[in-house]
Amino acid sequence: MAADDIDVYGQQEALRRLYERALTTPLPNYAAPTSFELNSAGIASTETYDVIITGGGPAGLTLAVLLAHQGLRAPGAVLCVERRPHPLLAGQADGLTCRTMEMFKELGLYDEVLKVGHEVAEMVMWAELPGTKGIQRVTHQASNENMTPSRVASLVACSQGQIERILELELASYAPGTLKRGAEIIHVEMDARMDTKYPVVVSIRDESGHVTFARCRFLVGADGAHSVVRKCMGISMVGDLSDRVWGVIDFPAETDFPDIRRSGHVHSALGSVMHFPREQSADGDWLTRFYVDMDEANAGNMDSQSAQVGPLTPQHILDRISRTFHPYHLQIKPGTKVEWFSKYSVRRCIASDYIRHDFQGLPRVLLVGDACHTHSPKIGQGMNVSMADSYNLAWKLAHVLLGISSDPRSILESYASERYPVGRQLVEIDKAWNTLEWNTKITGREENYQDTRKDLLRTISGFVSGYGIQYSSGYLIRTARYLNEECSLQAGSRLQHTVMSRFADGLTVDLHDEIVPNGRWKLLVFATQYLSCQKGPFAQAVRSIFENLIPIFLPGCITPIIILPDLVSNVDNGGTSLTRSVDWAVFPSRIKCMAEMKTYVSQRAYDGYRISCHEGAVVLLRPDGVISIIDDLHATEVTSFLKTVVRTL
């Protein structure tokens, strides 16, 4: 081979590595090669995929992006089919709460969202009180009131179309060709032959009407409230349909109402309106969204069989807004127009099941987002919970497909056992909030209304932040306590953020910066102040984690993170020294060798989580950041638990 050829090859390899360094390091692939050889005429040439996602909205794209981040990037790994030829141009979902913003932070997309979104800092309620004429402000609060402190914006207005655009670009950078627009899945069936590795068969129709067939190992229905996947699998929606009619509209508002740029509710004898400040339009005008109760104006035009409502025009909605906001004036800003409007009735339903098994008992078809839960937009959780479904599911699919999971059936079934209760909680909270805030006139509210409202807002705050969601004990969660009762951490919940200083270079980071969704388990080792006593039991326990725990599992699947208190024991004089003042040599050598850039100092973490600096702890985080188990430094229970979920060597 000529020298020039070597140089060209070397340049190509260097260029490839240059681009790959900008991407998340994929999980290693331990799966046995799969083959698809069936003798049936025509079937052998059918396209096959590891995962097919039907629906390219926020839930479907989030799942595709996470799978790509975690290693499913090769052609034929994932196909996402979306009927629309482009991202949503206007309307539909518009609010992102702090857990979703944290997810974007972990994906490296937070700044992209803020660039096109609008942070909502405050919330208000206006009402027409007894004995008064016209509305007046009755509450005024920060949007993050009652919420667990977060390092990200608590509420951001950002159109669904922008979210889809951002996710689509991210997906293209990892796995180009994954998203197929202008096509839709029209039929799904499970292959009855038990020997096939691709048991799910889908029919895909393109824009011209041509139908092709594809097979996959797993199918995810992210195709919305009218899900074809759900219907083909015979999964029903259970719930109720309200006869209340609502209008929703986006436009640049011109008004003397003082709180138009705050999120709020307005109640008067003439109607009820929820207003939500939006981002700027393409023309630079600040948009506002209004949800308007049209019940009195249009109550007779309801088709109770289909959730479709009778004729409703933008002018009908605008007239109701104008009357409700009296004595303030509100109109479309001159020279602008309505950006989007729609009408809906509230259907609060949840799917009877989130998964369907194949004929060997392995979950093969899974539902996410509106395909498995529907509700009103009043607490702004549709897009947020849908994306959280995908966040829960992605790493589980990746672990099965990449041969990491030791029990594929149990890990996939945990998706339904964990997310079904969340979907039901969403429907129940939405119903309670609507009943309290929208279905009762101001004059008819009970004396304890304010106390009831505060309690419900605390529940909603915990739900939207994610800290109020608690997964029950199960295959992936061990709630038994192996640590003293003072520790505030709970298995099945999220870990609150905290600030740390990296021991190697002094860089200040947030613990959540280490909890990225790369598909790896995070082993947090709170190593005590006695780690510097290398012959002591605590240093021996930490050394054993590196020598006897991590090496028995598939390499590259568990990331150790060492957290030290501000003071460590001084073996020379029996006192203590500032951790930042000592050298690596005082700690077991395995730490610098295996976790040099994952060793941190944070007294705040010990204090905030109520972990003793004298006893330490081991906290195992799942790839989605949820606490699986909390153990003492000997990590006996952690080792036993990991053997049930991750393959050993």
Swiss-Prot record:
Domain of life where this protein originates: Eukaryota
Pathway: Secondary metabolite biosynthesis
Binding residues annotated for FAD, in chain numbering: Q92, I185, Y344, D370, S386
Required co-factors: FAD
Gene Ontology molecular function, alphabetical: FAD binding; oxidoreductase activity, acting on paired donors, with incorporation or reduction of molecular oxygen, NAD(P)H as one donor, and incorporation of one atom of oxygen
A Pfam family matched in the record: FAD_binding_3
Keywords, comma-separated and alphabetical: FAD, Flavoprotein, NADP, Oxidoreductase
InterPro entries reported in the protein's UniProt record: FAD-bd (IPR002938), FAD/NAD-bd_sf (IPR036188), PHOX_C_sf (IPR038220), RIFMO-like (IPR050641), Thioredoxin-like_sf (IPR036249)
Knockout-associated phenotype: Impairs the production of usterphenyllins and uscandidusins and leads to the accumulation of the terphenyllin intermediate.
EC number: 1.14.-.-
Single GO biological process annotation from the record: biosynthetic process
Top EC class for this record: oxidoreductase
Family note: Belongs to the PheA/TfdB FAD monooxygenase family.
Assembly information from the UniProt record: Homodimer.
Record function comment: Nonribosomal peptide synthetase that mediates the biosynthesis of usterphenyllins and uscandidusins, p-terphenyl derivatives. The pathway begin with the biosynthesis of 4-hydroxyphenylpyruvate (HPPA) from L-tyrosine, possibly by the aminotransferase ucdG. The nonribosomal peptide synthetase ucdA then condenses two HPPA units to produce atromentin.
Name of the molecule in the record: Flavin-dependent oxygenase ucdD
